[in-house]
C-alpha cells in the first residue's frame, strides 16, 4: 500500500486527506466520508483502507470543512464541525469526487459513516454514475433529526425547545457564528450550524428513492432504529439493498473494526464484480 498526503482546494478552507493506492493495479476507487466531529484519520476512514487496498481498491480519505468540533490551521480563525453548513458538506464531497476523476479514474464507490453516510446517500442520489454505496450507520437526516437525537440525550437533550429558540434568535440577530454550549454531543456548536441541522440536512429516506446503485447498509445492534432507519431505507430504495445488523456493536464499531472492514470488502468484490 502506498499513501500520499493530498489537499483539495475549495473557495474557502482546503480539504486535507490521504490517498491510498494498492501495490498492484487499481481495480476500483473508494471515496470515504467521515462522520460528524470526526476526520480522515479516525473511524472507518482509518481502518478501512488497509483492508480495501489489499483487495485492489484505492481509497480517498479526506476532511470536509466540517471536520472535528473546532480547529485552526494557519491563523487564529476557527473552522470545523461547529461552523459547517449543509451546502459546504455537499460541495466538499463533489470536489473530492472531481479530484478522483481528475486523476483519470472512474466514478468512485461511496462509503460513509454516520453523517458521512447520509451525505454519501445524497451524493449517490445526485450522481447516477456511482457504482455502489456503503452506509455505515447512516442517520435519517431531515427535519426531525435534531428532535430525535435530543430525545436520546445528544445535542440539546432535554433542553431542546430552549436551545432551539436561543439558536434561532442568535441567527436572526446576525450572530450565527456565536458558539453555544449544549448538554450533549457535540457539546459546542455555533448557532448557525445548529439551525443548519434543523433545516437543511439531507433526508436519507428521500435520497433512498433516487439511488440507483446497489447499497450495503450496516448498523450496530446497540443503535436506535428510529435514528438509523436501515429497514425503511430498504423499503424505499428502487435498487438492491443488503442490510446487515452487527451483534454487540455500537455506533463507532469499537472492537468490530476488522469484522466490518472484511464485510465491506467482501461485499464490494461481490457486487461490483471485481
Residue ranges and their predicted role:
Residues 1-24:
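N-terminal cap/lid segment of alpha/beta-hydrolase-fold proteins
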Residues 49-75:
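Conserved alpha/beta-hydrolase
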Residues 211, 217-219:
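Short beta-strand/loop motif that positions the catalytic acidic residue
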Residues 249-259:
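Catalytic histidine-centered segment of alpha/beta-hydrolase-like enzymes
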Amino acid at each position: 500500500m502506498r499513501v500520499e498526503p493530498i489537499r483539495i482546494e475549495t473557495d474557502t478552507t482546503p480539504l486535507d486527506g490521504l490517498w491510498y493506492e494498492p501495490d498492484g493495479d487499481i481495480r476500483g476507487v473508494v471515496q470515504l466520508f467521515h462522520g460528524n466531529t470526526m476526520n480522515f484519520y479516525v473511524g472507518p476512514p482509518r481502518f478501512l483502507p488497509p483492508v480495501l487496498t489489499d483487495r485492489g481498491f484505492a481509497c480517498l480519505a479526506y476532511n470536509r470543512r466540517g471536520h472535528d468540533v473546532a480547529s485552526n490551521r494557519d491563523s487564529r480563525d476557527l473552522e470545523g464541525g461547529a461552523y459547517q453548513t449543509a451546502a459546504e458538506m455537499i460541495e466538499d464531497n463533489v470536489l473530492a469526487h472531481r479530484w478522483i476523476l481528475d486523476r483519470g479514474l472512474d466514478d468512485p464507490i461511496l462509503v460513509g459513516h454516520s453523517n458521512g453516510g447520509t451525505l454519501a446517500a445524497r451524493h449517490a442520489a445526485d450522481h447516477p454514475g456511482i457504482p455502489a454505496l456503503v452506509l455505515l450507520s447512516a442517520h435519517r437526516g431531515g427535519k426531525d433529526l435534531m428532535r430525535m437525537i435530543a430525545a436520546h440525550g445528544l445535542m440539546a437533550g432535554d433542553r431542546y425547545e430552549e436551545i432551539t429558540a436561543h439558536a434561532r434568535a442568535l441567527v436572526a440577530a446576525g450572530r450565527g457564528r456565536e458558539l453555544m454550549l449544549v448538554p450533549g454531543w457535540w457539546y459546542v456548536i455555533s448557532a448557525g450550524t445548529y439551525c443548519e441541522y434543523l433545516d437543511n440536512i439531507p433526508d436519507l429516506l428521500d435520497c433512498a428513492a433516487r439511488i440507483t446503485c446497489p447499497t450495503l447498509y450496516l448498523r450496530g445492534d446497540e443503535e436506535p432504529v428510529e435514528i438509523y432507519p436501515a429497514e425503511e431505507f430498504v423499503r424505499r430504495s428502487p435498487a438492491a439493498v443488503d442490510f446487515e445488523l452487527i451483534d454487540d456493536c455500537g455506533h463507532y464499531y469499537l472492537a468490530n473494526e476488522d469484522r466490518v472492514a472484511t464485510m465491506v470488502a467482501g461485499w464490494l468484490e461481490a457486487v461490483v464484480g471485481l
